């Protein structure tokens, strides 16, 4: 089976300059998708200059780029998707439901969306009720397994299962873990066994051995 490798986004690091340099020197067609640092929609319904530079097709020529969006407002997600499709030609958007930053979580964005699963459900329901989204946009989600505990993770998976996600990218840590503590591989295993969407592993892949160990433990995952 062919290995599928993505480059996860890191704010302030993996901009278009980095992505293009990495692809030219190391990637060479081996990276299936490069994810942009998140766009955070604003009420002006316009992208910031730095966001425009990062998503400009001329700056992403020859690489498969997926734009990540962070919002808890379905209307903001939809206009962002429409603009990305109409003006920049993107037909896949990744929802950030994983960022652990305190300033993000305090606004119930990023992994803060997992605080209230019913609101997450309401958000996704509104997104997929939109005709434009259903007809034109592939929506994937980057998620964690909970905020302070993983007890609600089965409920969160049930919510994701209600919608036709392109894929579910799981970082198997809690929001309170940030990027420390051990990966919760039991929670990831639950996602693999119970998700209706394709599940993609994210987190702590620092070496080839890390990668091969995960592939061995979860051969059905990307």
Task: Briefly describe each language-model feature range.
Residues 1-222:
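Flavin-dependent oxidoreductase catalytic cores
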């Amino acid at each position: 089976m062919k290995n599928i490798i993505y480059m996860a986004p890191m704010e302030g690091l993996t901009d278009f300059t980095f992505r293009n340099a990495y692809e030219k020197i190391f990637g060479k067609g081996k990276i299936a998708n490069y994810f942009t640092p998140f766009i955070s929609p604003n009420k002006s319904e316009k992208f910031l200059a730095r966001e425009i530079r990062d998503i400009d097709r001329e700056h992403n020529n020859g690489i498969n780029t997926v734009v990540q969006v962070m919002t808890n407002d379905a209307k903001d997600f939809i206009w962002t998707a429409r603009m990305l499709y109409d003006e920049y030609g993107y037909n896949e958007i990744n929802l950030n439901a994983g960022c652990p930053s305190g300033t993000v979580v305090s606004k119930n964005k990023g992994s803060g969306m997992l605080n209230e699963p019913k609101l997450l459900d309401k958000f996704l329901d509104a997104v997929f009720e939109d005709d434009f989204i259903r007809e034109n946009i592939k929506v994937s989600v980057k998620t964690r397994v909970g905020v302070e505990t993983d007890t609600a993770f089965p409920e969160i998976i049930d919510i994701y299962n209600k919608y036709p996600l392109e894929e579910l990218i799981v970082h198997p840590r809690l929001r309170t873990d940030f990027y420390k503590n051990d990966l919760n591989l039991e929670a990831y295993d639950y996602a693999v066994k119970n998700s209706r969407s394709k599940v993609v592993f994210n987190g702590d892949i620092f070496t080839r051995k890390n990668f091969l160990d995960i592939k061995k433990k979860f051969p059905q995952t990307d």
